[in-house]
Amino acid sequence: RVLGKASHAAGAPEKGVNALSAASLGLQALGLNRETFRDEDCVRVHPIITKGGNLVNVIPDEVVVETLVRGKTIEAFTDAAKKTDRSFKAGAIAMGAKVEISTLPGYLPTLAEEALPELKHAAEISASGIPVIEASGHAGGSTDVGDVQHLMPVYTFNTGGVKGGLHQIDFEVTDEEEA
């Protein structure tokens, strides 16, 4: 949350501290930090502004930015989270605003590990002729299965019967029984 000082945008803008400008600088700094993320760490940072002010003729005194940070390892997303926080602190400092950062836990990264032979065999039997595809390594998304994988072995699977990308406009169920 970025906090500034409201003032009339036309009559006395110099008396305000624009929280939206501070947040915008934070977003720009975060964007410039992206080149510091190593490709092999699969870091993804997704910020959105959920509150950008109250009225168009008032210098915004509060802006709320929510951000999801993901990575292939705990170290990778911890590093990205620090850079994210630092970016928004810098934006606030530059504009004379204040920033309140609340860090909430997200999902732990998933672990792409070889399946235990007995689990793999059981999956092949239950698949009844449907080909079993080997794990292909880390995927860009995250899910609570990563949390469980850090505690115990987990055998994950996907089904067919769909085309297109998950959470994308082209996603479509093509075979309801298989899906």
Question: Each PLM stretch: what is its role?
Answer:
Residues R1-I125, G137-G146:
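Midchain, well-structured core segments that form catalytic/ion-binding scaffolds
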Residues A90, S128, K163-G164:
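Feature targets compositionally biased, intrinsically disordered low-complexity regions
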Residues K98-E100, P131, D170:
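Ser/Thr- (and often Asn-) enriched beta-sheet segments in non-cytosolic proteins
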Residues S126-E134:
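A local structural motif
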Residues I133-A179:
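Zn-dependent metallopeptidase/amidohydrolase metal-coordination segment
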